[in-house]
């Protein structure tokens, strides 16, 4: 993760217009949402609920077939009002998170995660499950801030991504 030169080599941006995007996003009439991946967003600690909501909505808008948000139980109602397409999971402990870690095709960890005990449980359980199930992870914000604490305790999943500007900082 700290090898920013290598990261910049694999990070390729491509300018697209609405016509190109429409062609890429075309789905057959008999397509099922299960064919387009399951994103699990983990975040939205107390006082930071909006970040998890925004990441979840972005996943829906990008075309993910299923999107789940694992967040504090105090954010469930607001989350469902904001984006009813998202399956909101009340998670107030690492143990509560475990049951949602077996089905995603990608885990997004960090939006509004914070840096308290709850945050540490979320990162520990998600790293453990991603490694075990060979699921790629996108780690953002406080997820990246907490990552060094866990690198020695847990092997990282094979595919871990983060924002280039955060990784280069």
For each feature predicted by the language model, list its residue ranges:
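Small-residue (G/A/S/T)-rich helix-start motifs and N-terminal tracts that mark the onset
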Residues: 1-141, 145-169
């Amino acid at each position: 993760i700290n090898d920013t030169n290598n990261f910049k080599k694999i990070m390729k941006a491509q300018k697209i217009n609405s016509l190109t995007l429409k062609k890429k996003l075309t789905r057959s009439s008999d397509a099922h949402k299960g064919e387009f991946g399951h994103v699990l967003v983990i975040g939205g600690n107390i006082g930071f609920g909006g970040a998890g909501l925004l990441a979840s909505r972005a996943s829906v808008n990008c075309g993910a077939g299923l999107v789940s948000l694992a967040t504090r139980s105090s954010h469930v109602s607001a989350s469902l009002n904001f984006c009813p397409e998202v399956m909101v999971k009340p998670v107030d402990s690492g143990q509560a998170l475990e049951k949602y870690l077996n089905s995603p095709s990608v885990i997004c960890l960090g939006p509004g995660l914070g840096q308290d005990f709850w945050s540490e449980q979320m990162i520990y359980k998600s790293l453990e499950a991603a490694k075990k199930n060979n699921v790629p992870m996108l780690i953002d914000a406080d997820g990246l801030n907490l990552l060094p604490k866990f690198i020695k305790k847990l092997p990282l999943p094979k595919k871990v991504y983060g924002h280039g500007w955060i990784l280069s900082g």
